[in-house]
């Protein structure tokens, strides 16, 4: 019997674990962006985040010195470079984690229904823990917004 992995997660005990700062997130984001539907969703979420931050955009610009384009970093698996700076890595890792959750949802995995026995995050991985908890509370990734 050949059972799709995410189908098994929907019915078997499992844990979700999310990595943090050392994650080569630009590479993961580039991989996710190769899927046109996922790329559109990620750009939509990034734009929504920018809209929420608009009231403090001048302060953010004063801190970073320039706008941060999360999709503009080189996808290098060996070196993060400028993508390691907190002004890029915090939103970049969060967006990439959201991308993983969106991709899993498109493949039929819903943590609200699958009920993982644990959701763990190391360092910035805790952001995805909060995303997963929001999905569980809302019932689906779509309802969580």
Regions found by a protein language model. Give the residues of each.
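FabD-like malonyl-/acyl-CoA
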Residues: 2-145
């Amino acid at each position: 019997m050949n059972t799709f992995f995410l189908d098994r997660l929907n019915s078997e005990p499992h844990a979700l674990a999310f990595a943090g700062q050392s994650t080569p997130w630009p590479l993961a984001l580039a991989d996710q962006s190769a899927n046109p539907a996922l790329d559109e969703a990620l750009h939509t979420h990034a734009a929504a985040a920018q809209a929420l931050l608009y009231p403090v955009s001048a302060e953010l610009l004063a801190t970073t010195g320039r706008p941060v384009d999360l999709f503009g970093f080189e996808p290098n698996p060996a070196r993060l470079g400028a993508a390691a700076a907190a002004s890029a890595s915090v939103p970049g890792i969060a967006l990439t984690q959201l991308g993983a959750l969106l991709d899993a949802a498109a493949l039929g995995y819903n943590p609200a229904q699958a009920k993982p026995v644990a959701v763990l995050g190391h360092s910035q991985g805790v952001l995805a823990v909060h995303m997963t908890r929001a999905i569980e509370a809302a019932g689906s990734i779509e309802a969580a917004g």
